[in-house]
Amino acid sequence: MADKQRKKVILVGDGAVGSSYAFALVNQGIAQELGIVDLFKEKTQGDAEDLSHALAFTSPKKIYSADYSDASDADLVVLTSGAPQKPGETRLDLVEKNLRITKDVVTKIVASGFKGIFLVAANPVDILTYATWKFSGFPKNRVVGSGTSLDTARFRQALAEKVDVDARSIHAYIMGEHGDSEFAVWSHANVAGVKLEQWFQENDYLNEAEIVKLFESVRDAAYSIIAKKGATFYGVAVALARITKAILDDEHAVLPVSVFQDGQYGVSDCYLGQPAVVGAEGVVNPIHIPLNDAEMQKMEASGAQLKAIIDEAFAKEEFASAVKN
């Protein structure tokens, strides 16, 4: 696999996130082949036809309504399939129904002979990334979740608006669960090497209460958007496109994705969001940022919360019987 061109993507799930992701791939000229799988075959046929009409403005690409068997020679399978988060519902409320969907999808993808990389975006993403690893039997590095990539983008954008700097020049991360127990790594947030906490103090941008409020607006952004329009999909779609490009082009880009935890942060046997080098083999190398004591406690708490849910779910025979890892 290391020597072949990584240009074929199979998307499973043609809902709001999936179709937005497909549109992002077309707009950005990412991948040479895109197959779309969904229970609603006509929807995938319609989207494939509609998307193909944009190719004359972007770059050549084969786009089609696919079946699970088409994943056999794919380089990347992207999972957006799952029940959507409803108003007032947390990502963790989705666990069991989306575990069932994930088990079914992953089993069918693996049965096709697929040997590439799994990229998981369905929620709760850290738990479903773990489940994809368990159900697939794949090496840990070849199962990647979108993790805190969207949260980090939201964080950088919120900071950029406050300090009047291009968001791409803000170096800051959200880590932990993609959800309510996530946290901001303020100890390493900086612009051009200047810590943002110091910048705030010197330039009178934000006081302590405003800093807390800014983070909370980032953490709770999905709830706000869901209450207004029913779902979030544009931001995560572009985040997935960015991760896709890093994998297909073997970029070795540092991105905040959902990574298997081996005890580096006092957390084991689960996936959590942290920066990692991402390339053709998936997670090439996790980057373990040295956290301060408060941040370490938050990472441990986030992991403990997810691990408890994982253990409870996988104690059930319907999931335990499908485990390959």
UniProtKB/Swiss-Prot annotation:
Listed Pfam families: Ldh_1_C, Ldh_1_N
Enzymatic reactions: (S)-lactate + NAD(+) = pyruvate + NADH + H(+)
Location of Phosphotyrosine modifications: Y223
Subcellular localization(s) per the UniProt record: Cytoplasm
UniProt-annotated binding residues for NAD(+): V17, D38, K43, Y68, G82, A83, A121, A122, N123, S146
GO molecular function: L-lactate dehydrogenase activity
Major localization class: cytoplasm
Keyword Cytoplasm belongs to the record: yes
EC number(s) stated in the UniProt entry for this protein: 1.1.1.27
Regulation: Allosterically activated by fructose 1,6-bisphosphate (FBP).
UniProt-annotated binding residues for beta-D-fructose 1,6-bisphosphate: R156, H171
Pathway info: Fermentation; pyruvate fermentation to lactate; (S)-lactate from pyruvate: step 1/1
GO biological process, alphabetically ordered: glycolytic process; lactate metabolic process
Record's GO cellular component terms: cytoplasm
Keyword Signal: no
Active site: H178 (proton acceptor)
Binding site for substrate: Q85, R91, N123, P124, V125, D126, D151, T152, A153, R154, T232
Subunit composition and interactions: Homotetramer.
Role this protein plays: Catalyzes the conversion of lactate to pyruvate.
Record-linked NCBIfam families: L-LDH-NAD, PRK00066.1
Family in the record: Belongs to the LDH/MDH superfamily. LDH family.
Name the UniProt record assigns to this protein: L-lactate dehydrogenase 1
Source species: Lactococcus lactis subsp. cremoris (Streptococcus cremoris)
Lineage, top ranks: Bacteria, Bacillati, Bacillota, Bacilli, Lactobacillales
